[in-house]
């Protein structure tokens, strides 16, 4: 397994611990996708990808359909995707992705958490160089498929040679700009796409003591308690026992 897998697995275990929070996060993604491309998943690849992620995370079908219906309503809030970047304690880089209908409220809340933990909120783009932004596709294993051949077919779309493999799933990483092309190829070639989203992987990780790690975990948890926050990424190296089953 690659470094991206270990980082993603460890952070996912924390991030998806609260089911209600997960459904709220996906609901906002559905609203953004519907506003951009319409309510029909068949004609809206972005929405189709979000619905696949909702299914993987066990979000009830009724909830998904209700979120799509609500997104078409005239009273639906207009969410804006905003990123906030800065440093937490111990020099750890913290990248916060949000979807908000009130940026003034959101930046105040995010800054408050940074201040509480002795961190500093920086300017937009200040941490771009510290993280690699990737498209990420989780597909069901398909009998008779040679992974080397599949990667070769997708290499023009920026899909990386290194991939993650679980018992019945494979996760591919690619160029974010080629998200739609990768999704189209996988669907047209009969792959079951169980999740399609974007992620950020730290280019270098910083090791901490258990006590320092606990402080960063608390900071991330506090950030994720804000309903506007979609994802929180750090360059903290996962503990040796994190990411294991």
UniProtKB/Swiss-Prot annotation:
Give any Pfam family that matches.
Answer: Transcrip_reg
State the Gene3D superfamilies in the record.
Answer: 1.10.10.200, 3.30.70.980
Q: Name one GO cellular component term.
A: cytosol
Superkingdom: Bacteria
Q: PANTHER family under this entry?
A: TRANSCRIPTIONAL REGULATORY PROTEIN YEBC-RELATED, TRANSLATIONAL ACTIVATOR OF CYTOCHROME C OXIDASE 1
Name of the protein described by the UniProt record: Probable transcriptional regulatory protein BF2589
Instruction: Kindly list the biological process annotations in GO that this record carries.
Output: regulation of DNA-templated transcription
Q: Which UniProt keywords apply?
A: Cytoplasm, DNA-binding, Transcription, Transcription regulation
Q: Where is this region: Disordered?
A: 225-245
Keyword check for Coiled coil: no
InterPro entries the UniProt entry points to: Integrase-like_N, TACO1_YebC-like_2nd/3rd_dom, TACO1_YebC_N, Transcrip_reg_TACO1-like, Transcrip_reg_TACO1-like_dom3, YebC-like
**What molecular functions are annotated in GO for this chain?**
DNA binding
Question: Localized where?
Answer: Cytoplasm
Name the family. Answer: Belongs to the TACO1 family.
């Amino acid at each position: 397994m690659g470094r991206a897998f270990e980082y993603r697995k460890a952070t996912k275990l924390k991030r998806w611990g609260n089911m209600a929070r997960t459904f709220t996060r996906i609901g906002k993604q559905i609203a953004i996708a519907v506003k951009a491309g319409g309510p029909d998943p068949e004609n809206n690849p972005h929405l189709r990808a979000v619905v696949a992620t909702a299914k993987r995370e066990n979000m009830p079908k009724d909830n998904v359909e209700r979120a799509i219906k609500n997104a078409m309503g005239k009273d639906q809030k207009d969410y804006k995707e905003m990123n906030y970047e800065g440093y937490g304690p111990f020099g750890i880089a913290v990248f916060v992705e949000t979807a908000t209908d009130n940026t003034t409220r959101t930046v105040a809340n995010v800054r408050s958490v940074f201040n509480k933990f002795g961190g500093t909120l920086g300017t937009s783009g200040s941490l771009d160089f510290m993280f690699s932004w990737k498209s990420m596709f989780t597909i069901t294993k398909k009998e008779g498929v040679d992974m080397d051949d599949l990667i070769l077919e997708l290499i023009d779309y920026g899909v990386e040679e290194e991939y993650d493999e679980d018992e019945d799933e494979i996760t591919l990483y690619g160029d974010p700009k080629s998200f739609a092309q990768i999704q189209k190829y996988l669907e047209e070639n009969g792959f079951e796409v169980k999740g399609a989203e974007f992620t950020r992987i730290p280019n270098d990780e910083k090791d901490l003591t258990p006590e320092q790690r606990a402080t960063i975990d608390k900071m991330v948890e506090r950030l994720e308690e804000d309903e506007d926050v979609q994802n929180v990424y750090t360059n903290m190296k996962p503990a040796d026992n994190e990411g294991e089953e």
